[in-house]
């Protein structure tokens, strides 16, 4: 399994491309700028099969509409709350920016804590609920790799003062993920460093 980080210009978010040479597709963790992703996807020659969202805030989904135009069969995977957020410009906070948007008309998969997501030819991905920054926050475990979104950015205090944030849950999720890092998991967070 190969993991490629793609740095986006909006809010320094990071999209991760997961793929294997053995299959003709890839899976994304979050979806940043499609203009940044497209050249890489074209060069790889792989179609996008699914996007696993760490949560539904606009900086993690702002390229999703363009991606879905190019790859209409993409499965968008997140919690029920996450699906509500991406379908509403106010809930995903894009209304605060120049170009508010909502994502509509897509293939939906609801993820829950403890679930395992499987794709032929790729390692299984374990879903871990990590609420607090937002109620929709998920982290993904792939072998000894841990994709934490905004729930855990090493050395950065978790921000939980959004309408669907929760201080106690945020601190609990942060502590759990920090302990996993101490156990040897490699952290792939959604901003700053990876």
Language model region names:
Residues 33-118:
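Active-site HxH/HxHxD metal-binding segment of metal-dependent hydrolases
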Residues 6, 18, 115-121:
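Short acidic-hydrophobic surface loop/beta-edge motif
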Residues 1, 46, 74, 123-125, ...:
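A structural micro-motif
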Residues 1-44, 138-149, 154:
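Conserved beta-strand hairpin/beta-sheet module of binuclear metal-dependent hydrolase folds
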Residues 27, 52, 76, 146-148, ...:
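Residue-level marker for buried hydrophobic side chains located in beta-strands
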Residues 26-29, 50-52, 127-129:
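Short catalytic-loop micro-motif centered on adjacent basic/acidic residues
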Residues 124-194:
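Metallo-beta-lactamase
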Residues 6-8, 107-108, 128-131:
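Short Gly/Pro-enriched turn/cap motifs at secondary-structure boundaries
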